[in-house]
Structure formats: structure tokens, C-alpha cells
């Protein structure tokens, strides 16, 4: 699963997701892509599940690029713990995704295969997304 090798700080504020994605919203590597339509935190497990689904469907053909990286730690407190005594410990990692962000890219396969593979990956995501292709 994806996670940073090291970070400057163990814990982060939750923050907020305002506006559209101004970076990572264009196809850069492949010909087909899956684009987010809603803001969300996408966990490393969800990213990996989507990647595996695309890889399985595409078999040997084509190349896949994962365009998001989970670099935000999410902390949780143990269950049935009283309030206070500081912030919980980091449990998992998430990628902050805003509308317009490209999640996955694909190349070297036909559009029908890419569309079907991206649909399967989209079903693994907690947000609505759309299939887009590079207009030449």
C-alpha cells in the first residue's frame, strides 16, 4: 500500500477541501483517464483496490499510472477511550482529491478495454468519477 517513506510531522490538521483541483487535472501520461467529480479523502487501500482492478482487467496489455498519492495521515483514538489526553495515533493515509483531479491514467490498450477497466476502478472509489480520453 502507498504511504510516504518519511514525513516532517507525524500528525496533521484535517483541513478543508475548497474549490476545484487546479493541478493534476489534465492527462499527462496515457490516453485514457479516470477523473474525480466530487471532493473526498481517498485512502491508500481504495487506491490500491482500484489499481488492482485495472491491472486485472487489462491483463498484460497497456500501462497504468496512478496520479494520486496518500500523503495525509489520519489519526484515530482507540474505541471506548475517554475524551482528552491528546490526539490519537496515525492509523492510515489518505490522498486529498478535489473535483477535476485525475485518479488513474491508462495507455497502450483499446478504448473499450480502458473504459471497462476504469468503470470497475470507479466502483471501488467513494466518489463519482468520469472516464475521459485525450483529445488530439
Curated annotation (Swiss-Prot):
<dbReference type="InterPro" id="IPR000114">
    <property type="entry name" value="Ribosomal_uL16_bact-type"/>
</dbReference>
<keyword id="KW-0689">Ribosomal protein</keyword>
<dbReference type="GO" id="GO:0032543">
    <property type="term" value="P:mitochondrial translation"/>
</dbReference>
<dbReference type="InterPro" id="IPR020798">
    <property type="entry name" value="Ribosomal_uL16_CS"/>
</dbReference>
<dbReference type="InterPro" id="IPR036920">
    <property type="entry name" value="Ribosomal_uL16_sf"/>
</dbReference>
<keyword id="KW-0687">Ribonucleoprotein</keyword>
<dbReference type="GO" id="GO:0003735">
    <property type="term" value="F:structural constituent of ribosome"/>
</dbReference>
<dbReference type="InterPro" id="IPR047873">
    <property type="entry name" value="Ribosomal_uL16"/>
</dbReference>
<feature type="region of interest" description="Disordered">
    <location>
        <begin position="1"/>
        <end position="20"/>
    </location>
</feature>
<comment type="similarity">
    <text>Belongs to the universal ribosomal protein uL16 family.</text>
</comment>
<dbReference type="GO" id="GO:0005762">
    <property type="term" value="C:mitochondrial large ribosomal subunit"/>
</dbReference>
<comment type="subunit">
    <text>Part of the 50S ribosomal subunit.</text>
</comment>
<protein>
    <recommendedName>
        <fullName>Large ribosomal subunit protein uL16c</fullName>
    </recommendedName>
</protein>
<dbReference type="GO" id="GO:0009507">
    <property type="term" value="C:chloroplast"/>
</dbReference>
<keyword id="KW-0150">Chloroplast</keyword>
<dbReference type="GO" id="GO:0019843">
    <property type="term" value="F:rRNA binding"/>
</dbReference>
<dbReference type="Pfam" id="PF00252">
    <property type="entry name" value="Ribosomal_L16"/>
</dbReference>
<keyword id="KW-0934">Plastid</keyword>
<dbReference type="InterPro" id="IPR016180">
    <property type="entry name" value="Ribosomal_uL16_dom"/>
</dbReference>
Amino acid at each position: 500500500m502507498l504511504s510516504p517513506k518519511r514525513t516532517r510531522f507525524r500528525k496533521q490538521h484535517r483541513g478543508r477541501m475548497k474549490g476545484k483541483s487546479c493541478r493534476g487535472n489534465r492527462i499527462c501520461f496515457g490516453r485514457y483517464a479516470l477523473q474525480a467529480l466530487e471532493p473526498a479523502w481517498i485512502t491508500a487501500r481504495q487506491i490500491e483496490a482500484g489499481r488492482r482492478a485495472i491491472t486485472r482487467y487489462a491483463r498484460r496489455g497497456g500501462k497504468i499510472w496512478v496520479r494520486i498519492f496518500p500523503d495525509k495521515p489520519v489519526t484515530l483514538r482507540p474505541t471506548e477511550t475517554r475524551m482528552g489526553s491528546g490526539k490519537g495515533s496515525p492509523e492510515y493515509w489518505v490522498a486529498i482529491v478535489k473535483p477535476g483531479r485525475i485518479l488513474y491514467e491508462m495507455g497502450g490498450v483499446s478504448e473499450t478495454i480502458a473504459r471497462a477497466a476504469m468503470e470497475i476502478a470507479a466502483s471501488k472509489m467513494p466518489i463519482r468519477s468520469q472516464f475521459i480520453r485525450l483529445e488530439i
